[in-house]
Structure formats: C-alpha cells, structure tokens
Amino acid sequence: ARNRMNITREKESGFEIVRQYYNLVDEHFRTKKQVQDYADMLHKSPKTLSNIFSTCKLPSPLRVIHERVEAEAKRLLLYSNKSAKEIADILGFEDQASFSRFFKNISGQSAVQFRNTQEGKN
C-alpha cells in the first residue's frame, strides 16, 4: 500500500509540474523557445521534464512549445493584417526566414499559403 501511495504522489507532482510548464509556456513562448529555459524555471533538468511528460503520455516539452507558437502564429495570420515579418518579430524569431522555416516545418505550408487557404474558406 505504501508503494502505491508513493506512485500516486509521484504522479500528482508530475501533473503539477506539467501544469506549471504549460502555464510558463503560455507566459513566455514569445521569448523562450528552448526546453532548457523552462526546465531552469522549474528547477528540473530537460531530461526530467521529458520523462515526466512521457510518464503522463503527453507530447514532448519541445512539442508543447512549438504547438503554442504555431497556435499564436495561426491566430495572427487569420485575425490580423500583420505581415509574416511582423509576426516573426511578435513571436520572437530572429528574422522572417527563421519564422517561415519553423511555420512550414510544423504546418506543412508557408504562412502566406496558410493565410490564403484559410481566407478562401470564409
């Protein structure tokens, strides 16, 4: 019974760390894009974070950051008239090329293609 209690406690603390991680990503995704940044804020190693996320059957910590940046990029593309360069600046990319590469890798199409296909649906 004691072993089961320890496992339950570990899981609860894991979920708490995951919750804190998601909150930190929401707050800092524009300026911090590395798991190491968040690991430092949580006083954990990136490997420990990865293990916790894996145990909880969640996407990797890096994937969480990428999905948050992707969601904000898509929101800005759909609901603002900002250029890809302006969006790259807002999201903290060094330049438009870095943003464009990131967006194409994660969504399978360029930012301009995404905006155009979505506008065609409205």
What are these regions (language model features)?
Residues 55-96, 113-122:
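Terminal helix-turn-helix DNA-binding modules in bacterial transcription factors
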Residues 30-31, 79, 91, 106:
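Helix-turn-helix/winged-helix DNA-binding modules
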